[in-house]
Amino acid sequence: MAGKARVHELAKELGVTSKELLATLKEQGEFVKSASSTVEAPVARRLRESFASKSAPANGAKPGPAASARPGAKPTPGGPRPGPRTPAPAASAPQAPAEQTARPTDARPGPAVKPGPAPTPARPAAPEAPAAKAAPEAPAQRPTPGGPRPGQQQQRPGAPAQGGPRPGPKPGPKTPRVGNNPYSSQPAPERERPAARPGPGGPRPGPAQGGPRPGPGQGAPRPGATPGPRPAAAQGGPRPGGPRPSPGSMPPRPNPGAMPQRTPRPGPSAGGRPGRPGGAPGAGRPGGGGGGYRGGGGAPGAGAGAPAGGGFRGRPGGGGGRPGGPGGRGGAAGAFGRPGGAPRRGRKSKRQKRQEYDSMQAPSVGGVRLPRGNGEIIRLARGASLSDFAEKIDANPAALVQALFNLGEMVTATQSVNDETLELLGSEMNYVVQVVSPEDEDRELLESFDLTYGEDEGDEDDLQVRPPVVTVMGHVDHGKTRLLDTIRKANVREGEAGGITQHIGAYQVMTHLGDEDRLITFIDTPGHEAFTAMRARGAKATDIAILVVAADDGVMPQTVEAINHAQAADVPIVVAVNKIDKEGANPEKIRQQLTEYGLVAEEYGGDTMFVDISAKQGTNIDALLEAVLLTADAALDLRANPNMDAQGVAIEAHLDRGRGPVATVLIQRGTLRVGDSIVAGDAYGRVRRMVDEHGEDVEAALPSRPVQVVGFTSVPGAGDNLLVVDEDRIARQIADRRNARKRNALAARSRKRISLEDLDAALKETSELNLILKGDNAGTVEALEEALMGIEVGDEVRLRVIDRGVGGVTETNVNLASASNAIIIGFNVRAEGKATELANREGVDIRYYSVIYQAIDEIEKALKGMLKPIYEEVELGRAEIRAIFRSSKVGNIAGCMVLSGSVKRNAKARLLRDNVVVAETTTISSLRREKDDVTEVREGFECGMTLTYNDIKEGDIIEAYELREKPRD
């Protein structure tokens, strides 16, 4: 603890209580726990200076006219260091060398020679320059009896008279020592006043030489080896040198508390701390560099030696460069790292101390220091990377990567990370990670462009009645499309492959309610189980749901799913019991079954309207439409503002060969016009053309109107929100951001998590089936991909969709499939141009499907065919060894009796001895019955056999078995 001091010791030294000293330390930004804590030497020095400045007089006494010399005359180099005793005035008669050392005293007027050093930075005046030039020519002078006494200093020629003693300077930053080589001819620069730096001096004498070192303004010789009074030469001329003092002759360090105090001089200049004796004008802190440079030297501004334990480590006596007398240059001993001195520590700023204090409390994961939070909520987008997380918490991404590696996850800084990993990492650092939902993220994106979605602009007077949007839902083959055909008086069902709806259709029909004509918008959704997402989108975009249930079939799984979608979207349901004209129809049974799902008929006291219809015969269709309109008028407020920018939803989208990307859009509010700039999901464009369900052009689409929009630059996703913006530039920026977010989320979802524990298993060879999906519209491709990814056939085979798109199979798809060994699945599309020829040449398999479940079944069979076969053991029979015949050619021959089953030649066998397995994998190499070779011997017959294992004994049991391939489920 060299250089350190305890708080209670400092308090006793300064004459204050420990409590007051602790309060002072707290004001200075030092973190000290108690009075027994230690503080560093720089902190103790600041405390002494602080209390010294408080006890010093406010204003120094005015000096007389003759007070021309600076305070702080240098003592003789040979004088011993004063001890901690009461100082005597230095202006008295000549004392012994121990008493000649000057001490800081209160400034008072006096003659040219003033006592008491006041170490201040050297500030040579401008008239000093001529003398500095002539100084190297002056010869070294020996001390004479008539010379100035030690501790005194003559006024420099041409220097202005000092008006008073300079107050003690504040400690400042220490410049690196220049010229620490005693043999260097390069002088040390002056601190903070480089313009007044003296010129180059002569070569330094060696450590044992006592000759003077000529130089401009260098008035302090090197400390001598023998103490003795040596007069200091006038500043500006050379001073006599002498041998270096021995460490034993150095006096103990004086007690700063017992010394007279002085008023500190304000300003940024650096200098020595109070209480240290000796030093030239501008002398530095005790044992440290003075005002000029750190290290001894007699130049103006030279200090009393090298810093204590600083750059000159290892000087005997605990600090390099401490002179034996005032004004002497620090010796070269210890200047080059010789051990013996404690290393000097620089002062730390409050920010550094605060950072160190925070790092002490920072959590460590596997030895990695991480920032520590206070439970803050960090919002991250789905699929964010560690770089995004590190930017939020102001951390190093490399540290997060290493921390995740220690937690068993191998990711890179720019790789998308799934939600669970982000939450786990955040909890380790005391952060609450919230993965922003896509809806919230999209809302924040639109808010950044001053856009909102889902709200009508204006007040109540701007709202107008709009037609209800009705979605027809139900199980497959229950008659949904037939019902819409009957309503529209068209045959849409025959256009669908297999009679199964595989798209969402949107139509607007005119119906009559009493004497009033009313418009109703119908949305037809698929009923197959693969189209769950389509049904969910239909439920979200609708006002009323018609649940079609076949009277002869009852409630089916997709019926229940449709009910759940409608109830989740808080949509009222009207039940249409279809096929009442068929044999075995039981509408009452349907009503009873639906009560289990919260749909209670009105005749049973509920609030759900049931209508028995026959879509094929056209029975009660008007009653169903009337029920829909009554429900809409009674339960819903169907109004929207048509005088605003249009907002809607893309129900379906596909790529048309002649028209390009086409989206079926349902307008929810506002009016969509030709020429509007639009954005839907990650697709944007300008409305070039709008077509209704009859193929007629539409110039403006009002709320609840379904239209086909032509003009997108790419195919939007099914279910994406459509928004009209002011400029194409804004639409493009929104689409680009959504596209980037979509890619990140897809990468995070598709990334296979590989932890350190299952690294060996991950490195094993696994079979992978690569697919490229092409469909006629976005919804079909989405449904097909979700259905295929849901196939579970085991961990040995993995399905991977490397590309997906809308439109025909192109040559680009074939080239990608050839490079990645993939199969192309075309759903309701065919190959374009020379794609088929290229596929045949490259050996790429293209499969075409028109019904979705056929594609699912074939892909599942292909995956199962890629699985490694599973074998099961089937026991054939058991035989007991009754005798052993030894042969020099074939070895031991076992004479056996077949106890059960049969024994076959070349079958695998297991040798048991006292019910203990002796040989596990042996083979029956030969089998004979009497003298004939046979392939099989049945139960109850004797035989002779040889095994691939010769250590057999009488009484052993041979168990024959075979491995048969087990079919995959």
From Swiss-Prot:
It is found in: Cytoplasm. GO terms for cellular component: cytosol. Belongs to the TRAFAC class translation factor GTPase superfamily. Classic translation factor GTPase family. IF-2 subfamily. The lineage of its organism: Bacteria, Bacillati, Actinomycetota, Actinomycetes, Mycobacteriales. It comes from Nocardia farcinica (strain IFM 10152). It comes from the Bacteria. This is Translation initiation factor IF-2. Residues 474-481 are annotated as: G1. Residues 269-340 have a biased composition (Gly residues).
